[in-house]
Amino acid sequence: MFNSNCRNKIFCILIFFSLAFFTENAVCEQPKKRDYWPTGDWKASAPEQQGMDSAKLLIADEFIQNRLPDAFSLLVVRNGYLVFEKYYSWGSPEKIAVVHSVTKSVTSALIGIALDKGYLDSVDQKLIDFFPEYASGDLDPRIKEINLKHILTMSAGFRWNDRGPVMRDWYTSEDWAKFTIQLPLVTMPGDKFNYNSSISHLLSIILAKSTKTSTLDFAKQNLFEPLGIQSGFWRQDPQGYQIGGFGLGFSARDLAKFGFLYLNNGYWNGQSIVPEQWVKQSTEQQIQAVRHPFYGTFGYGYQWWVKQVDGCSSFRAWGRRGQYIVVVPELDLVIAVTSNPGLPHPPTSIHYSPLFDLVAASVKRKRPPKSPLTAVELPADVKAFILDYDQARFNKDVVKMAELISDQFIYNGVTKQMAVEFLSRNLPYMSEAKIIITKYEQEGNEVKIDVWLKDKYFEAPFMTGSKLIKENDHWKWFGNQVPNSP
């Protein structure tokens, strides 16, 4: 096992090897039978004994130190054994981390357990049936059509922004459930994904009402204690309900246990903890979620994110400020990450994705050769524009970047102002990566391009399918004019 003293281990002197990233055709494996269960604690194993490459794991370690300064821990479990465990900054095995929205995935598991035990009937049950006190005559009739599945898939349709003033108003209100249910509806239930922590909280209230116990007590009896999870805390709302969308405290090892439960389809030491069918439904895409210019499309299940990792199907619990459980069933792999929960939201948050590809790439398996990125030839004026833009990006020159981006810019819902703010942050992975144009099509004053970023750790599409447009004889970045999911 790697730990904080791993540099004293013999296998730590192995030489770094190059990695292949974003390989869609990588050969994946199936989970194996377990010869022990980590109810008490994890058993350690050298990476090579579990079919992993120590040197490549060390590249993941280097990536954290060079790219993710807020990280507290990285744990890697392969074949049920802890093959890598390292703590950074203030992290430690005993530290209970605020895991933010990883809480949502735990709440989802509890909903599945409650359904299995008969406390709930089905995901088709209407939200308002659990809150009849708010079913007044002037309530939008569409709200009465919202069911549990809409809540689980973030498609209830309420007007909401998790980082906007509505979140603050909800958080400071006296009755969180009432505030949420009386929000205006902007889309029909089930039509569109919109990330919303307030509706995840409703799931916790529904659990407490249905089971006639607190969400925490229900979790301890039916989930935490069978797995040997020692939860540190679970914050409450003003009415005393555990917060369904955030506020849970877990150690990194306990995060890995929860991921291991889902890796094993809800079974633990021969006992079904979370129904297998619920695990399957929760971790497969129920709705398209986020389209990100750097990492492509994320799907969403029942409070779980769905995204490939190094070419293999995968799902993840994702908490703000760098809290993750990533499960890759085809590689028999669980990755747990905790980070400083108290810092301002780091611009590196979504940049944890290459870390998971790095870890998965350390699993020894047959892999087809990776085709190198090939840059296309560009006309002199377009090439000059790209070079100017690249230099402004590297220098974080906000004024210059604003000059080079059209006022009409929109890329998957990202406006010019948002793009400039994002690009001007202290993002080493953005400023140090090389831009490679792999596709170029010009028609009049418009140019369609595919752009990739490449550095020593990764290569990834960036603003792919974007356009340049000539305005007053000057090329400017135009985006793609396609609205995105929130």
Model-derived features: positions:
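Short, solvent-exposed secondary-structure junction/capping segments
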Residues: 111, 258, 387, 391-394, ...
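Active-site helix/loop module of the DD-peptidase/beta-lactamase fold
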Residues: 98, 117-157, 182, 211-250
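Active-site Gly/Thr loop motif
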Residues: 230-231, 280-334
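Short, low-complexity N-terminal intrinsically disordered segments enriched in polar/charged residues
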Residues: 367-395, 403
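Short beta-strand edge/turn micro-motifs at domain boundaries
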Residues: 448, 461-486
